[in-house]
Amino acid sequence: MYGVLQVVMRDTSLLDGLTKEDCVSISGVIEHRDEETYNPKIPTGTIELEAHSVEVLGRVYKQVPFEIMTSKETREDVRLKYRYLDLRNKKVKDNMIFRSQVISFLRQKMTEMGFLEIQTPILCASSPEGARDYIVPSRKFKGKFYALPQAPQQYKQLLMVAGFDKYFQIAPCFRDEDARADRSPGEFYQLDFEMSFATQEDVFKVGEEVLSATFEKFAPEGSVVTQAPYPIISYKQAMLEFGTDKPDLRNPLRIIDLT
């Protein structure tokens, strides 16, 4: 069984010699909890382990660099240096679990819509887009280099030529560019898809259906989710009215030409 289980130690001598964050193996007897101590938030919330013996599997010899449960209050550079400890913080761990659930749902949704998931190559020829390439030297061919893909653009178009009329993948993209507010520097993942003989409206429809279903499923309880169909505005209208190509339509302010 994997997960969280409450342990009760009636023999406090079992704690002798233990230090905080030691990794231990505990043997004992599974018992029912008292009803007033039930925890409905976890699958094991009605049982507990009465410890009979404790074996230290991995001892902590140095003080951990920060308190695990409050790691989000620690300086970011320290958290990143000890990322494996930071990920033990429940709030941080929940982010990883949430990401996994969203990706799993996206795969399910795209498959239901008739798309085929295909992984395209990571080591490829350079095809510059909007940023600099990450270059990987070839061991076999001296003086030659691979590039990490900024996007799987060429490969997915070749898949259309090959007769795979609906493709998708959760694609890793590598771009040597500065950090942005909505993605980390260097690499990010995107839902990438392509369809043969599709119109702009066909692409909008797929995107709208996937986004709508995803937000509907994962939006926090009680939050307001914008229902499809979503408003569509042209690039020209966005620039003239908002001064940006990705406006926040919740903002009621508009640019008005009075000349």
Task: Map each language-model feature to its residues.
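Class II aminoacyl-tRNA synthetase catalytic cores and aaRS-like
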Residues: 1-259
